[in-house]
Swiss-Prot record:
Protein name in the entry: Protein TIC 40, chloroplastic
Bias type Basic and acidic residues, positions: 245-257
Subcellular location: Plastid, Chloroplast inner membrane
Induction remarks: Down-regulated by cold stress.
Membrane topology note: Single-pass membrane protein
Cited Pfam families: STI1-HOP_DP (PF17830)
Encoding gene, per UniProt annotation: TIC40
Keywords annotated in UniProt: Chloroplast, Membrane, Plastid, Plastid inner membrane, Protein transport, Repeat, Transit peptide, Transmembrane, Transmembrane helix, Transport
Ranges facing Stromal side: 120-436
Gene Ontology cellular-component annotations: chloroplast inner membrane; chloroplast thylakoid membrane
Length: 436
C-alpha cells in the first residue's frame, strides 16, 4: 500500500492520498499503454478487456463506415461516368441549329470539291487552248517574214509580169531583140492559151499572136511601173496575210466553241445558249463573287490549291481568269446547274455570309469528329467519287435532312445512291454521328 501511495503521489495529476478506487485508477490511465500496469484486479481486467473489445468494435464499425463511404463514392462516380456517356449524344443535336453540324460542313466540303473538280477540268482546257493559240501566233510571226521575203524576191508570181513588161522597155531597139521578145512572148502565150481549145485554134497563126502581143504591150506600160516597185507588192501581200490570219483566228474561235460543247455534251451547250433564261429560273446560292471572295482566304487557298492545276495555284492567275467575261459566264452557268433545293441554298447562303473556318463555333463543331475544317475538306478533295456523287439533288437533300435530325437516315435505307455516299463519308469520318 505504501508503494501504491508513493506511486500516486509521484503521478503528475493530483489525487487524494489514502484512497484507491479501481475505477478512478483505470479511468485516469486510459492514455497509458497496457504494458505499464503492474497491479491489476480481477474486476479491472474484465473492464479493460471489455473496453478493448468495444474499441475494436468501434474501430471496425468506423472502418466499415469509411469503406462503405468509399464504395458509395466510387459507385456514384461510376454512375456519373455512365450517365455522362449516355447524355453526350443527346447534347450534339442542339448546336446544329445555330452553327451547323459536321455533316453539313462535310456537305459543303463535298460541294467545294465538286465545284473545283469541274473548275480544274475547265482550266486545263482553257490553258491548252491558250497554249495552242500562242503557238499558232508564234508560227504566224515566223512565217510572215519568210513570205514577205519570198514575195520581195518574187520567185513564183513576178515571172509572167516581167515577160509583159520586158518588151515595153526595148521597144525602140533593133529587130533581133524584137524577134527574141516575140518568140519568147509566143512561147508564153501558148502556155496561157492551152486551157481552152477554141482559143488555141484562133491563136494558131503566128502573125495574129504578134499583133495581139503588141497591142497588149502598148496597153500595159503603166502596169509595169507599179509591178517593178517591190515595197508596194510586199505591203499588199502582208495585208493579204494579215487578212488570212484574221480569218484563221475567227475560224479557230468558232471551232473552239463546238469542241467544248461536244466534250461536255449537249446539256452544257443548251445551258450555255440559254444562259439569260436559266439564271432567272434557277439561281445557285454560291455565286462567282462569293467564290472569288472565299479564294482570297489564305486557309482556303491552302486547302484548295494542291488539288488545282498548276496554272491556277497562283492567286494572281486565278484572279485574272475570274475577270475573263467568257470564263466567268461559263462558271456562273455551271454553278446554276449545281444548285440544289431552296432550303439547301438558303442555309448555304446563311452559312457563307460569314465564312470563317477559324471561328470558335466552327472549331467546336469539328471537335466532335476530331478533325479540323481543313482536314475535312482536304480529305473530301482527295476523293473525287464523293464529290461527283454530291451533284445528285437527292444526296444534297439527304445530307440537309440528316444534319438537322440524325435519325432521318432511316428514310434513306432503300436509296442506294444516298447510302453509298453516307457509307463513304462514314469511312472517311468515323466520328460523324447519324449515318451508319
Amino acid at each position: 500500500m505504501e508503494n501504491l501511495n508513493l506511486a500516486l503521489v509521484s503521478s503528475p495529476k493530483p489525487l487524494l492520498l489514502g484512497h484507491s478506487s479501481s475505477k478512478n485508477v483505470f479511468s485516469g490511465r486510459k492514455s497509458f499503454t497496457f504494458g505499464t500496469f503492474r497491479v491489476s484486479a480481477n474486476s479491472s481486467s474484465s473492464h479493460v478487456t471489455r473496453a478493448a473489445s468495444k474499441s475494436h468494435q468501434n474501430l471496425k464499425s468506423v472502418q466499415g463506415k469509411v469503406n462503405a463511404h468509399d464504395f458509395a463514392s466510387i459507385s456514384s462516380s461510376n454512375g456519373q461516368e455512365t450517365t455522362s456517356v449516355g447524355v453526350s449524344p443527346q447534347l450534339s443535336p442542339p448546336p446544329p441549329s445555330t452553327v451547323g453540324s459536321p455533316l453539313f460542313w462535310i456537305g459543303i466540303g463535298v460541294g467545294f470539291s465538286a465545284l473545283f473538280s469541274v473548275v480544274a477540268s475547265r482550266v486545263k482546257k482553257y490553258a491548252m487552248q491558250q497554249a495552242f493559240k500562242s503557238m499558232m501566233g508564234q508560227m504566224n510571226t515566223q512565217n510572215n517574214p519568210f513570205d514577205s521575203g519570198a514575195f520581195s524576191s518574187g520567185p513564183p508570181f513576178p515571172f509572167p509580169m516581167p515577160s509583159a513588161s520586158g518588151p515595153a522597155t526595148p521597144a525602140g531597139f533593133a529587130g533581133n531583140q524584137s524577134q527574141a521578145t516575140s518568140t519568147r512572148s509566143a512561147s508564153q502565150s501558148t502556155v496561157t492559151v492551152d486551157i481552152p481549145a477554141t482559143k488555141v485554134e484562133a491563136a494558131a497563126p503566128a502573125p495574129d499572136i504578134n499583133v495581139k502581143e503588141e497591142v497588149e504591150v502598148k496597153n500595159e506600160p503603166k502596169k509595169s511601173a507599179f509591178v517593178d516597185v517591190s515595197p508596194e507588192e510586199t505591203v499588199q501581200k502582208n495585208a493579204f496575210e494579215r487578212f488570212k490570219d484574221v480569218d484563221e483566228s475567227s475560224s479557230f474561235k468558232e471551232a473552239r466553241a463546238p469542241a467544248e460543247a461536244s466534250q461536255n455534251g449537249t446539256p452544257f451547250k443548251q445551258g450555255f445558249g440559254d444562259s439569260p433564261s436559266s439564271p432567272s429560273e434557277r439561281k445557285s446560292a454560291l455565286s462567282v463573287d462569293a467564290l472569288e471572295k472565299m479564294m482570297e482566304d489564305p486557309t482556303v487557298q491552302q486547302m484548295v490549291y494542291p488539288y488545282l492545276p498548276e496554272e491556277m495555284r497562283n492567286p494572281s492567275t486565278f484572279k485574272w481568269m475570274m475577270q475573263n467575261p467568257e470564263y466567268r459566264q461559263q462558271l456562273e452557268a455551271m454553278l446554276n446547274n449545281m444548285g440544289g433545293g431552296t432550303e439547301w441554298d438558303s442555309r448555304m447562303m446563311d452559312t457563307l455570309k460569314n465564312f470563317d473556318l477559324n471561328s470558335p463555333d466552327v472549331k467546336q463543331q469539328f471537335d466532335q469528329i476530331g478533325l479540323s475544317p481543313q482536314e475535312v475538306i482536304s480529305k473530301i478533295m482527295a476523293n473525287p467519287d464523293v464529290a461527283m456523287a454530291f451533284q445528285n439533288p437527292r444526296v444534297q437533300a439527304a445530307i440537309m435532312d440528316c444534319s438537322q435530325n440524325p435519325m432521318s437516315i432511316v428514310k434513306y435505307q432503300n436509296d442506294k445512291e444516298v447510302m453509298d455516299v453516307f457509307n463513304k463519308i462514314s469511312e472517311l469520318f468515323p466520328g460523324v454521328s447519324g449515318p451508319p
